Amino acid sequence: MLSIAEASSEAHVGSEVSVRGWVYRIRSSGGVTFIVIRDSTGIVQCTAKKNELTPEQYDEISSLGIESSLSLIGTMKKEPRSPTGYEISIHKFTVYQKNDVFPITKDQGEEFLLDNRHLWLRSREFTSILKVRSTIFRSFADFFYDQGYYQVHTPFMVSTAVEGGSTLFKVDFFGEPIFLNQSAQFYLETMIYSLEKVFTIAPSFRAEKSRTRRHLTEYWHAEAEVAWIDNREMMDVEENMIYYIIQRVIEENYDDLKLLGRDPEALRAMKPPFPRVKYSDIIKVANEIGMQLKYGDDLGADEERQITMRYCKPVFVTNYPKELKPFYMPQDPDNPSEVLNHDLLAPEGYGEIIGGSQRIWDYKELMQRIREAGLDESAYYWYIDLRKYGSVPHSGFGLGMDRLAMWIMHLDNIREAIPYPRTIRRTKP
Amino acid sequence: MLSIAEASSEAHVGSEVSVRGWVYRIRSSGGVTFIVIRDSTGIVQCTAKKNELTPEQYDEISSLGIESSLSLIGTMKKEPRSPTGYEISIHKFTVYQKNDVFPITKDQGEEFLLDNRHLWLRSREFTSILKVRSTIFRSFADFFYDQGYYQVHTPFMVSTAVEGGSTLFKVDFFGEPIFLNQSAQFYLETMIYSLEKVFTIAPSFRAEKSRTRRHLTEYWHAEAEVAWIDNREMMDVEENMIYYIIQRVIEENYDDLKLLGRDPEALRAMKPPFPRVKYSDIIKVANEIGMQLKYGDDLGADEERQITMRYCKPVFVTNYPKELKPFYMPQDPDNPSEVLNHDLLAPEGYGEIIGGSQRIWDYKELMQRIREAGLDESAYYWYIDLRKYGSVPHSGFGLGMDRLAMWIMHLDNIREAIPYPRTIRRTKP
Ligand SMILES: [Mg+2]
Ligand SMILES: [Mg+2]
């Protein structure tokens, strides 16, 4: 048995090949049935001829509906009029399952398609999306492994919240309330004392009521923490990581990008260094293009969209006002009202994909910020301990993998970047 | 700046080196302070001499407690009496943080150590455990990527349970109840029609009240589904995968295994093929060694421990009685009271690490089993659809990554195999 991509090559022309898959298109005309078969590697046109099969066989194969499954044996030929330039002339076949009508056709509503996501995933678009996504996950991990990072794992059911309590999902843990984690960061920080450079790729959960095109209630979060490096060095790592992923996707999924309408060359042009712009300068840029933003305003989805439409490369926004960022980000010694942070905004209107910063490593500074934030010190005992015993300077970041995938593939909605999106209105299938 | 492993080499003997890390041991004697420093790569003994430093410097470095953090510059020498054969003679140093007393010392109770897991992880044993774990995760994924599998992602908040409802954690989803997923299997099955060969590595959640040494309420679950293959071929893939992981761990973590007291050569001997024993024969074996088991009894932790003490390789147990296994496993045509399944039991008393099977792909057969099991058909509409539209034969498995790690490292308790174990009695830190 060959994959369709393997079979569709010069080497097999004139030979008998066996392939299997699903009916992608079918039509009959003048005693010949043309069936386009798809598998995970591609499509190929096959022909069944009335005068070469028994009447029962010809009837069986001619009556297959879209997405019927079958295997077949036939002769591979060159055929310039077929969609791929190859064609298989069928001698024998076995039907695994005959469908009459496949539920997904053109012109169906969004809700119907979401209810039938398990079938919709078979489209060529989704197949390409899933392949690109797989490359993105693999290459993220490879980038860090190859630089001596270790992959680690942090808990999901937690009692301490990294980013505050309003967007936490509550779980009934044998009768006690507990929360689903929103970030691995604090736990990753505990592991730099053993391993120095760590990353994790895991789901995070946010009970956000947002219905924007870039929010999910569960999403894949890739996070890293690194001992001994500062905010600038962290940005150096990240821009190289993003470009490494882009290059791998172009190399391994060129045709998938094309099929999705994403120009691989536009991506290839997004080479580091990425611009690094202070928050205060981004506010100026925003006002120059007619937005009404003042210093101290946060950048939401809308603002980021308008701003990043101006950029053709990802852009780091640094030095946010302290009030807009969490307690663990250190103040900039040159301007204590700002913190040593960086958000990475994807260009072309996509907006935030990474949030990162240097982390406060001084015990007194951390305790002051915890008190200012009004947090319960006892819940953070283990996080505070890290600054009491052998604390070292360090930085880290969190990357929204689904957002990265959405931007790399230039998709319209984050729901298209993940097989089974979970939003405030959607938990099935 | 060099890592301790890089600095501790012939090439640097006689040269000035810079290293940094944490105090692992310290003692003073006759005007010399011996400090063993550790970083993520290893340890090295350093000496500070009273007559080569200022009195303030000598006092500062001599008074550092365990786990204090520092960087230092000094001359690398060979020193047969040091723990690694190398020694650095300190010229200059910078203390990042001085500790007086590190909370973790010898002879501390289990609960204290679990409460201070964030500090306990710095031990050399845990550092090695975390490194081996990282290799296991990387090599699992590499094995499948290299065979053309795609990594995919499935949802966590679900309304359909794979293995029944009694051990589900309930989440408050904006006021509605929803459950944490226990297995990606059904969702993986939906993706074989696009990609044919898929895997995922993700947390699974089980509200089991067991307090055995091999259960966690959240654990890392690696699952795969593969179109067109049967139960036997699935076992072939799995035994090769297990052996690939073992080989990578031996190659990349030989010293870690030694430090943990696991003999790498005992692991290396566990070459495929692994024995494949029918459930009915395992019951006979159990009774021969004095256990009181009858056909139809399930194998729990205790039974698997006793049975696998007899094996020095992993063993597949196939052909379970239908009643002991879930509805989606097909009956063996040669014996319809048994199913085409396989559990992989790790030897040396460890027991089940994989559960897998062929999956029912015939629509009528599936519907009959769903009805026999008394399940709500409407909740499974999307799973049933897979047998209505282009169904194909397929098989899959789920592997408990923490259990695999526990067995590979020969650990006593699964809690030692994961940084932050979650059990019925433990949700912090
Ligand atoms: Mg933002
Ligand atoms: Mg069992």
From Swiss-Prot, chains A, B:
GO terms in the biological process aspect are:
asparaginyl-tRNA aminoacylation
The family database entries (Gene3D superfamilies) matched by this protein are listed as: Bira Bifunctional Protein, Domain 2, Nucleic acid-binding proteins
Q: Does the keyword Transcription apply?
A: no
| Record keywords | Aminoacyl-tRNA synthetase, ATP-binding, Cytoplasm, Ligase, Nucleotide-binding, Protein biosynthesis
Keyword Lipid biosynthesis (UniProt): no
Q: What is the superkingdom listed in this entry's lineage? A: Archaea
Q: What is its main location?
A: cytoplasm
Q: Which class of enzymes does this protein belong to?
A: ligase
Recorded catalytic activity of this chain's protein: tRNA(Asn) + L-asparagine + ATP = L-asparaginyl-tRNA(Asn) + AMP + diphosphate + H(+)
The molecular function terms in GO held by this entry are: asparagine-tRNA ligase activity; ATP binding; nucleic acid binding
Pfam families on file:
tRNA-synt_2, tRNA_anti-codon
Which locations, inside or outside the cell, does it occupy?
Cytoplasm
Q: Which CDD domains match?
A: AsnRS_cyto_like_N, AsxRS_core
Catalytic activity, EC: 6.1.1.22
SUPFAM superfamilies, alphabetized: Class II aaRS and biotin synthetases (SSF55681), Nucleic acid-binding proteins (SSF50249)
A cellular component term from Gene Ontology for this protein is: cytoplasm
| Entry's family note | Belongs to the class-II aminoacyl-tRNA synthetase family.
Name-wise, this protein is Asparagine--tRNA ligase
* Originating species: Thermoplasma volcanium (strain ATCC 51530 / DSM 4299 / JCM 9571 / NBRC 15438 / GSS1)
